[in-house]
Amino acid sequence: MRGGNLKVLVVYDITDDSLRLKVAEILKDLGLFRIQKSAFIGEMTSQERENMEEILRRQNLGPSDRIDVFPICDRDLKMHSQIGRGKFGRGPP
């Protein structure tokens, strides 16, 4: 993960394929790593997180679409468990 002071987990449920792909590209461009089909994790400053949230707010989400951004502390991240060997990995620690 990039240098910074805040780890974030972003998960989303978006019905429109093109918008879902666009959100994934935005998150990748911001330096987050995909850990599931609709979940990304990364490290960023508070300002970068605010900027990311503003960019995501500007997307034309449908009435049932949702994006959640969770701050995660190092202690909680270290307690992470991965069960199975799905297509996506955890990304850099």
Curated annotation (Swiss-Prot):
Its EC number is 3.1.-.-. Mg(2+) binds at residue 13. CDD domains: Cas2_I_II_III. Its cofactor is Mg(2+). GO terms for biological process: defense response to virus; maintenance of CRISPR repeat elements. The keyword Repressor does not apply. One of its GO terms (molecular function) is metal ion binding. Keywords: Antiviral defense, Endonuclease, Hydrolase, Magnesium, Metal-binding, Nuclease. Transmembrane segments: none annotated. It comes from the Archaea. CRISPR (clustered regularly interspaced short palindromic repeat), is an adaptive immune system that provides protection against mobile genetic elements (viruses, transposable elements and conjugative plasmids). CRISPR clusters contain sequences complementary to antecedent mobile elements and target invading nucleic acids. CRISPR clusters are transcribed and processed into CRISPR RNA (crRNA). Functions as a ssRNA-specific endoribonuclease. Involved in the integration of spacer DNA into the CRISPR cassette. Homodimer, forms a heterotetramer with a Cas1 homodimer. Belongs to the CRISPR-associated endoribonuclease Cas2 protein family. This is CRISPR-associated endoribonuclease Cas2. The lineage of its organism: Archaea, Thermoproteota, Candidatus Korarchaeia, Candidatus Korarchaeales, Candidatus Korarchaeaceae.
